[in-house]
Amino acid sequence: MFLSRAESSYLHQHLSVVRHVTLDPEGPGVLRIHLLPCKKARRNVPFVALLNGQDILPLSVSWAILLAGLMDALQPFEGKEITEDQWAGIAAQAVETAAAVYPKTAPDQIRADLNAMLTSFRALTAGQEPPVHVQPMDLGAYARYMAAPHRMDLMVSSMEKDGAWHCNQKCLHCYAANQPLGAVKELDTDQWLAVIQKCRAAGIPQLTFTGGEPTMRNDLVSLVHAAQWFVTRLNTNGRMLTSALCRELADASLDSVQVTLYSADEAIHNTLMGAPGYADTISGILNAVEAGLNVSINTPLCSLNQDYTATLALANSLGVRYATCSGLIPTGGAETDPSKATRLTPEALTAVLRPAMAYAEQNHMEINFTSPGWLPDAVLLDLGFTQVPSCGACLSNMAVAPDGTVLPCQSWLRENAGLGNILHDPWHKIWNAPACRRVREESAKMEHICQLGTTVPAQGGL
């Protein structure tokens, strides 16, 4: 179905690029909204609202126009505290804008829609039931309308520098170790700043700073500060998260930090990280929490750290409420025999997760399992997970290698995996290249498998 002339005109003037607004930026209920246009607007093709870089919601054309009108009305108040009277004026302006596009709709109805939309957004980001039904976003069906992924992982730190190992630990399961594109020469500060602007121009709303170990770069705070338009996350081993660095990252508007914590047992953690850094990691988590950053932990699960419930209990005691866990990504260090020997069977992995999920529910924690294909959908749902992981390569996420090479995902670092260079190649050519389209088409099947290969032991194992 086609749009009206008024709708088409408004969308052309106000929604031809990604729009962004942050509500209550200094408060506990901060809400960051990115409104993403589709390639070609149609009445039956939704726009997309990305909330805090996590919740992906389809919006009708009318609600997208209403939200864009609100964003326009909020622009003069960017970075300022908004009084109740000012907010009433902002809402009235948004309603007036939408009413000009939809003159046959009563302003009271538009005002009610605006309130329902914002109330639903806040409920979803708080993990609550929204007052109106929200249709889940089917990325597989929506893939052909996308012009860019929703997240780009920037591998700002290389695994090697000047011919030597360039990480402060050597994790047994490191996906970037022994991979050609994980060890290329790093871009300098100005080049990474240019990459960040390229991502914004492409309409990518979320950036993750990762590596290698991104905290080994002296310019990390500057890069994060330059990315304030995006929802930003830092993936780190946490060892260099001093109090001062955490405060600087918070001041630079970093949205969240994910720290790899292998185990509550110091000896096991150090064995898996290949360095005696347990105390540093715990200190880093505490510093990040104290600085007010949104902190989560990530734990790749194997036969050596099966007491995952104890790891969650430790995280809980440190003030962390969010956790992700996974099997072993079958690439890099996880393809070596020592790592393969620790892979868990589906039965063993299920036995690890069941008590962990019970602990999380009892202690108001949230866990996401992120490895496609490791466990059947029915098992994950029975365990209590609300989402079944699926491959997002060239669909929901992509990555930029240390030298600017664009990759299907941050683990896809093997030779000849590059899809172009973000500094030298136009984005539309990278996104629409045959190799990128092939990977995206596989991801869009939503078959809950990892395109990098088999991850689960065929038989036997632990």
What does each model-identified segment do?
Residues 129-151, 371-379, 418-437:
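Short, charged low-complexity linear segments at domain edges
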Residues 6, 11, 405-462:
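Flexible mid-to-C-terminal extensions adjoining Fe-S/redox cofactors in radical SAM and related proteins
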Residues 2-4, 10, 33-36, 255, ...:
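Radical SAM enzyme [4Fe-4S]-AdoMet core and its adjacent flexible, acidic
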Residues 57-58, 242, 408:
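A sequence-level detector of short linear motifs
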Residues 160, 167, 171-174, 391-394, ...:
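Short cysteine clusters
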